[in-house]
């Protein structure tokens, strides 16, 4: 039993592996009482008034205490993050890490704006937002993939974020964190994919130190035939029903 999990974990791409590990360690620490959620959540008065700067970082690593809701979030996130990192970011782990950093900064800026303008004051953890950003970018990068919903109907991948939002609305969940993630994901998609086609200029450039940091960590770039095989394998995977992801627990916002 341990060996298959060890092999699965070992084969995870580097950025997905690091983030998943950080989330698991954080939630286990909370479960064991080593740290409380009150020490992790995002609180701007404490950040800037009490200099508790770690909150800008830790709020991205806590979804929930160990339980079904946590495992649903982890499975959904790791699945799509791995698909994204192994396909359009294959051989470009530094670029993928930069996407996460860009999204995190943008989410912090948006959350600070909402907090200080008193539009929304209860976004305590941005982990669901960063996960939704990953799902959004994956969906836009895979327009030809199809997803089966409960075996009743299928839709193309770009509609996945909106299906999740609609389900959240039907279950009367707060959609703030998901909407923030959608904005961050679309901002990255526009600046990285759409804007260069319009202007022939690229605004987002991965810093050299990140490339040096990730040197040797990237998965090898595959040729066109191998890339097609990877995409076909991923197509088969995303054809699986998504009922495990679109239920009430999975859409629960922290």
Swiss-Prot record:
Protein name: Probable derlin-2 homolog
Keyword Glycosyltransferase set for record: no
Family statement: Belongs to the derlin family.
Compartments, as annotated in UniProt: Endoplasmic reticulum membrane
Membrane-spanning ranges: 18-38, 96-116, 119-139, 147-167
Main location: endoplasmic reticulum
Membrane topology: Multi-pass membrane protein
Entry GO MF terms: signal recognition particle binding
GO cellular component: endoplasmic reticulum membrane
PANTHER family attached to this UniProt entry: DER1-LIKE PROTEIN, DERLIN
Keyword vocabulary terms for this entry: Endoplasmic reticulum, Membrane, Transmembrane, Transmembrane helix, Unfolded protein response
UniProt GO BP: endoplasmic reticulum unfolded protein response; ERAD pathway; regulation of retrograde protein transport, ER to cytosol
Transmembrane found in the keyword field: yes
Stated role: May be involved in the degradation process of specific misfolded endoplasmic reticulum (ER) luminal proteins. May also be involved in endoplasmic reticulum stress-induced pre-emptive quality control, a mechanism that selectively attenuates the translocation of newly synthesized proteins into the endoplasmic reticulum and reroutes them to the cytosol for proteasomal degradation.
Topological domains, Lumenal: 39-95, 140-146
InterPro entries assigned to the protein according to its UniProt record, in alphabetical order: DER1 (IPR007599), Rhomboid-like_sf (IPR035952)
């Amino acid at each position: 039993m341990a060996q298959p999990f060890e092999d699965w974990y070992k084969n995870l791409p580097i950025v997905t592996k690091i983030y998943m590990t950080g989330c698991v360690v954080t939630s286990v620490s909370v479960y064991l009482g080593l740290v409380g959620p009150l020490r992790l959540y995002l609180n701007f008065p404490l950040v800037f008034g009490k200099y508790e700067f770690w909150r800008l970082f830790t709020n991205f690593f806590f979804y929930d205490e160990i339980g079904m809701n946590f495992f649903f979030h982890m499975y959904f996130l790791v699945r799509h993050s791995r698909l994204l990192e192994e396909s359009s970011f294959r051989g470009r782990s530094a670029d993928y890490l930069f996407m996460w950093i860009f999204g995190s900064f943008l989410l912090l800026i948006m959350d600070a704006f909402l907090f200080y303008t008193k539009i929304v004051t209860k976004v305590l953890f941005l982990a669901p937002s960063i996960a939704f950003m990953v799902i959004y970018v994956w969906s836009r990068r895979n327009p030809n993939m199809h997803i089966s919903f409960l075996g009743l109907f299928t839709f193309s991948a770009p509609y996945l974020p909106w299906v999740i939002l609609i389900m959240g609305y039907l279950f009367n969940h707060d959609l703030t964190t998901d909407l923030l993630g959608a904005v961050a994901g679309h901002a990255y998609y526009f600046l990285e994919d759409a804007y260069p086609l319009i202007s022939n200029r690229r605004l987002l450039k991965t810093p050299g130190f990140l490339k040096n940091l990730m040197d040797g960590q990237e998965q090898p770039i595959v040729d066109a035939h191998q890339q097609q095989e990877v995409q076909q394998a991923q197509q088969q995977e995303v054809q699986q029903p998504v009922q495990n992801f679109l239920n009430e627990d999975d859409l629960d916002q922290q």
